[in-house]
Amino acid sequence: MKKYFRFVVLLFLPVVCCLLTVATHAQNDSGLVKHKIAIFAPLYLDSAFDQSDEYRYAKNVFPKFINPGLEFYEGSQLALDSLNKDGVPLEIFVYDTRSAKETFEQQLAKPEIQDVSLIIAHCSNNEVRLLSETAARKKIPVINATVPNDAGTVGNPYFIILNPTLRTQCEGIYRYVQKYYSINHIIVFRRKGSADDAIKNLFDEYSKSTMATPLKLRYVDLNENFTGDQLANHLDSNRNNHCIAGSLDINFGRQLTLQLASISKSYPITVIGMPTWDGIKDFSKPEYKGIEIIYSTPFYNSKMDKVSQGISNHFSTKMYARPSDMVFRGYEVTWKFAKLLLKHSKDLASNLGSKQDKVFTDFDIQPVLNKKTLTLDYFENKKLYFLKWQDGIIKSVN
């Protein structure tokens, strides 16, 4: 706990010192044009610190709800530190979207936002629409780094979604199964309800538009307390069974995989899950051995490259902790799009799909067209990695 609290102190102090001021990462040469970037993240500073900047919680307590936004910010800060060492002309504004002093809408209306060239946001579903509207109204590229939601965005070439929408995820899973397992026995296990119906509808819709041979998907609705024996009634012991989890619910996915693993000695099974499975760590446990588990994710980092190792070493030596995936996300998004801004300046919106300045992820940013008007609605990352858990080991399979 002592080491972890030291991590808290080291991490929070820089945020407290710079949040309400403009952190300038630029050379003093007045001839340089300083590109301005606004970063929005849920830092919860007013929840963590009182008016005297004293930590509100006990020294051995660190609320988990603070982690994601703070870790994203820390990654962004590391990227900005690296850019600052290169003397790049950037001016950074950081906003705590959970501030008790001003609303998110008020932050977006601040005078300095009028002049920024790029907005990077670790946002929630409730904030996506405001970000999209701001991007369109001010003609500022906005990077939605976290939420797979377009909030009904139409006709907005300045809005970019890095975490693919459910439609993109379902189409990607369908194509993956179509490419590798089309001749096998394919069952979609699901629950009754509108959430799982949405996934079924997306599969069925893509099945009608695909240029390749459509998959023969068989849908099976499961009750709440289903067993391995009940699943076995829908499997074939003489064929490879590919079972798709037709639900985003993590508990359903975990239970489905566990029950399939329990009968895997009698049935050859591969289970294919949803992007929400990226947060399931149980798959490394012994009870999941014997079954092949595959799921999709837009963000994959093997952490074998020099940049990843440098970030890990920084956290280990300075903070006595391991960097989370959100730290790497913050670093990657800030570095890549800041570099693109420096190269393309006012023409950034036309170069958002550039493959240059890759850090960890092979982003494939493509225009999303309105099916009725065939005009551009927004940009979206279409890249999906497929990862496989087998006997406690995970690796990329595409």
Where are these regions (language model features)?
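Bacterial Sec-dependent N-terminal signal peptides
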Residues: 1-34, 188, 394-398
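N-terminal extracellular/periplasmic Venus flytrap/periplasmic-binding protein-like
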Residues: 27-110
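Short beta-strand elements in bilobed, periplasmic/extracellular small-molecule ligand-binding domains
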Residues: 84-99, 208-224
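Short, well-structured alpha-helical segments in soluble
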Residues: 101-117, 229-239
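Periplasmic-binding protein-like
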Residues: 112-124, 142-145, 185-191, 218, ...
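Extracytoplasmic ligand/sensor domains, especially the bilobed periplasmic-binding protein
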Residues: 120-189, 193-203, 279-281
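Extracellular/periplasmic periplasmic-binding protein-like sensory domains
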Residues: 257-329
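Segments of small-molecule ligand-sensing domains
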Residues: 320-324, 338-394
